[in-house]
Amino acid sequence: MGRYSVSPVPKCLLLMFLGWSGLKYYQVNAAQLREYRLAAQLEDWDYNPQPEELSRLSESDLTFKKIVYREYELDFKQEKPRDELSGLLGPTLRGEVGDSLIIYFKNFATQPVSIHPQSAVYNKWSEGSSYSDGTSDVERLDDAVPPGQSFKYVWNITAEIGPKKADPPCLTYAYYSHVNMVRDFNSGLIGALLICKEGSLNADGAQKFFNREYVLMFSVFDESKNWYRKPSLQYTINGFANGTLPDVQACAYDHISWHLIGMSSSPEIFSVHFNGQTLEQNHYKVSTINLVGGASVTANMSVSRTGKWLISSLVAKHLQAGMYGYLNIKDCGNPDTLTRKLSFRERRRIMKWEYFIAAEEITWDYAPEIPSSVDRRYKAQYLDNFSNFIGKKYKKAVFRQYEDSNFTKPTYAIWPKERGILGPVIKAKVRDTVTIVFKNLASRPYSIYVHGVSVSKDAEGAVYPSDPKENITHGKAVEPGQVYTYKWTVLDTDEPTVKDSECITKLYHSAVDMTRDIASGLIGPPLVCKRKALSIRGVQNKADVEQHAVFAVFDENKSWYLEDNIKKYCSNPSSVKKDDPKFYKSNVMYTLNGYASDRTEVWGFHQSEVVEWHLTSVGTVDEIVPVHLSGHTFLSKGKHQDILNLFPMSGESATVTMDNLGTWLLSSWGSCEMSNGMRLRFLDANYDDEDEGNEEEEEDDGDIFADIFNPPEVVIKKEEVPVNFVPDPESDALAKELGLFDDEDNPKQSRSEQTEDDEEQLMIASMLGLRSFKGSVAEEELKHTALALEEDAHASDPRIDSNSAHNSDDIAGRYLRTINRRNKRRYYIAAEEVLWDYSPIGKSQVRSLPAKTTFKKAIFRSYLDDTFQTPSTGGEYEKHLGILGPIIRAEVDDVIEVQFRNLASRPYSLHAHGLLYEKSSEGRSYDDNSPELFKKDDAIMPNGTYTYVWQVPPRSGPTDNTEKCKSWAYYSGVNPEKDIHSGLIGPILICQKGMIDKYNRTIDIREFVLFFMVFDEEKSWYFPKSDKSTCEEKLIGVQSRHTFPAINGIPYQLQGLMMYKDENVHWHLLNMGGPKDVHVVNFHGQTFTEEGREDNQLGVLPLLPGTFASIKMKPSKIGTWLLETEVGENQERGMQALFTVIDKDCKLPMGLASGIIQDSQISASGHVGYWEPKLARLNNTGMFNAWSIIKKEHEHPWIQIDLQRQVVITGIQTQGTVQLLKHSYTVEYFVTYSKDGQNWITFKGRHSKTQMHFEGNSDGTTVKENHIDPPIIARYIRLHPTKFYNTPTFRIELLGCEVEGCSVPLGMESGAIKDSEITASSYKKTWWSSWEPFLARLNLKGRTNAWQPKVNNKDQWLQIDLQHLTKITSIITQGATSMTTSMYVKTFSIHYTDDNSTWKPYLDVRTSMEKVFTGNINSDGHVKHFFNPPILSRFIRIIPKTWNQYIALRIELFGCEVF
């Protein structure tokens, strides 16, 4: 069946399926049945709907043929009325925990379509998705409903998938057609699905706890990929473009639930913003919702300020393309329920903050200092002004602060360099009032618009896209030379939540023309703080240092001053072509605080200092900015991470503890422009205040300098907020009462005084010739200081003893000594060059792959020892890793030692995320002031060897007891982008103590590592330049022939993902792609939670660049399921895989003992005498009852079972034999297996060597059972005896189940099917015995142990009532013996029904006639038949056709419950 094609279903199968009335009349035991009648229908859609009188005059060019979901009345004749606001969206489906959703679906369109939910419990015939899952054709009728046909989908909302404790009342998901994700979405087939907590919905389906709820879908429709193609790209909200979304209505003091969906068939991000409002999302206060295409979020908002407010995505291209609408808040007379009454003490803490800010035009130098280490190409492209480029200096407008309303005295005589281009920091806590007196000293209108606070229209300072000129008030656009006062109060609804940082990072900017104003430079950082977060001076109480880092992309081509800059800085202004791609690119400046390159100055912090970083992304950027912190981790939203993702026009607050000495790098992870422009170095230094100036301790100069290696200059500074604060009189009194003004009288804090300690530091600094260093040693400025680095176990020693500085054993020893009982884990890893095939199983089995799929790459490979001669062969647990390097596992407080050998042809290294390491083990090169001795780790030459030593601090591991392991990554850091695209990346798992065994494997955990990556071979070191895409191809957007969306480097067909139903499965998901590589992971049929955040339910997981996510899943549905990205174009091109969930009872005898496996299916390398392979059946009896062989030297005997189909093997039972009191048995053996009989795999399991040796028998009679974990899928199994007693001897049974699942016994043999549920046409009864129907149980013992009818004719039948609709996949039959009479059924047929009245025969697919099954050939053996297609029924009858002597039946049915 083609992936997106609809295979014709044979008529007999369709009749059989339609005859399964259980689907039609299926009764659901649910809290509530919620029924919907949905149709897919054609509709002409206008993205810019005009008023009726205008639409008659002209036909819009933006009318497109779409397929949309619409809701109908009972008979599908009348469409239900719908809200105009919903636009293209299908009806919102909703259900509470315990409910069942029944969707009656009819396809009125011209294409096969389906309905697939992102989150619900469903079975295979309600999935609505087409892929090779091993199900029968009739089970795929839901996959693609043909035009004119109908189908009924049944979805259950169970507690396992419902919102968790910390979730909002309703979680937002999408449903859509999954026949062809790209074309179906772009055609319009999508709607919202709300999964709600029990008791959260009213009778009409509306939420109880909100005044209003709205669903908004921010989407990009590519009409060229619609089923009805028409080239156009539309940026919309609910399908409305250019502000034509009907106004969203609300009343003041409403509590609104927002359900926001992002959708696009290509990678897309959205920064959803509601002007003048704040929202709460996942218990965090936000002003911008970060949304990813393919994912959804739920947020809530309490509104109080009346007016019409802009709703938009702040991604520049979205706003410019018309992705906006309006929220209209009216005064409906509702009482104020949002403002909390304050106590007297709280009222006294209220402050008034007054700022005097001007917009000024300046000449800005993006790179006042250009270090020699700056990339040459980057410098030529962005910083030099030859080739008629502007260069690094531009005329810009900036915000600057003044002392008073005269605007004559700036607060800083010299603007702080570390502040860069940023405006002054505006801080306020809840209930404080902020007044900004703004003077426009520039030459054109500007304003101030602040994110993160609720403001009135007078204080908004923003011009909307649809504002006519006459509506642009003074506050929206302050003319040159004019002054305007913005004033607002931080409301209770703006206050950071309990989970938030003390102060949360926001943004302010001019918004007369947001894009051009920001491009011109008018940006600044406000902070909104909790009630007690700020001192009276505006300093945050719970942080040693606050640091602002704004990652801004200034597109100077959109600046108001472009013409001025061309005239001033271009050598030949008249010849400049502004649309020249090279010229345009040279004017897009990637900066950190306005600096487009690294600087010679280094920011400095004290060892153990807690730094509160306020990180923001601003500017003309349509991609995520991943911020990487080397040597340390951010603590953000309760999670430690060393890459923090910033969405456009949004900010994050993160705490960093300075716990790793050295000079480190804060930079953007991603493109060349980002990594070169958005970067700064900082120094984590040890400064011992207690020892400073201690005259009693004399130190030799040599001792002082031994601890200092080429330190940078130091100016250490604690920032004060220059602001006029005007407390209320009562607040003033309280401040004095609390001693808040005492700092002014503290002589140690005075600028004019200089202590002897200061003088000593100045002396040392002058001796060392130190340069400037930004930090925070003192409360005020100290112009120079020295770094008196105290003795430290992992920083001081190596700098004193150069011989041990790079010795891995010495470094590891120091780590081990710092904490008792530390463990050292050693790995041997090499970089090797290989030919990698992105289609390893064969191109014929996949689609959408380019013609060339094999490329030279470099990969990490594990070895057994430091000789690097014997690779560590991967086993079943490593099968799924694909291109990934070996998993490096460790526990908290361990020391990891990796001996790295570079067997490739170019330099590579090892760089680890999340761990603690010295500079000599960083594996990454930048100007960190380290001596050459500490740079040997940066790049290991071909054939070179280096040992990296990493420490595992507690922050690297799980944060709570529910989290087992936490994932990170390692890769080569010589050139991270090119090295990773070349293939050099692997996972790191840090686990709780006691979770890892001596072989570095986790104990009793089912875990998988998945790396989502679009590999671009043109970015690989090994890609021939001659084969790269041409400029023309890139400009017209031709999909690269050399990109491969894949999971672990394998498109479509990643192997080895198998698990048991209801077991805890841990998935570690990695994304180390560039800023545009955004993936949304969806596991069909399952939901999951993020490790450490089990209070939040997830249906899909956005996986952002640099993200390492560990999630936990408890698979609830057996079968083969699809794992994919929700980004349609990547999914279609290969970013998908299958995972198999098998029943926990998958340990059934496969048929050696019962005889289901025939003699011809058993073979061996040889045998001795009459001990033939066919005798190797568990519990076989007789004189010759086993397989045996005499092992000769240099021979390796084996016995093989051909199962004639691929099955799941989970265990092996073995016996020896006894003959004439002589025991013969196998003591030890290993197993090999194959799917085709040609390619054999040795089972390795958890063994550290090449194969697992199973413990065999200890005598000739006892059965020894061995568990196969992980389970294997194979057709052929071989057992290889290695140790034995007397001779290698086997009697065997294999344990397992069918690959497709749904093959467990239904209860005839076990008694789960009750006697009363087994009936027959008649039964034989004599004076001494009764052969009643309930005796028809497989393997039943006794004198009367089967069913016999009263008479033997073709009208007899045996019937089983399964009590509910059941999927029956196979049957085993058995005869019986009475006295010496052998009785069995030789042929039979099957009938079934759901109502016990209308019976239907099981048909032969080939003939469409009643199928006659071959029965038994003796009275005790088993015969098994599979039903393909399976039977869906409650009642089943076995009708004997022919028999031996008399009719006698013992049976077992196999299958599973349907719902």
Curated annotation (Swiss-Prot):
Chief place where the protein resides: secreted
Residue ranges of the propeptide: 772-817
Sites carrying sugar chains: N156, N242, N300, N385, N406, N471, N557, N943, N1000, N1179, N1396
Cystine bridges: C170-C196, C251-C332, C503-C529, C672-C1031, C965-C991, C1146-C1297, C1302-C1456
Binding of Ca(2+) 2, residues: K919, F934, D937, D938
Organism superkingdom: Eukaryota
Region ranges (Disordered): 740-759
Function field: Snake prothrombin activator that attacks the hemostatic system of prey. This non-catalytic subunit is functionally similar to blood coagulation factor V. It serves as a critical cofactor for the prothrombinase activity of the catalytic subunit, which is similar to the blood coagulation factor X.
Subunit structure: Heterodimer of a light and a heavy chains; non-disulfide-linked. The interaction between the two chains is calcium-dependent. Found in its active form associated with oscutarin-C catalytic subunit (AC Q58L96).
Protein name, as recorded: Venom prothrombin activator oscutarin-C non-catalytic subunit
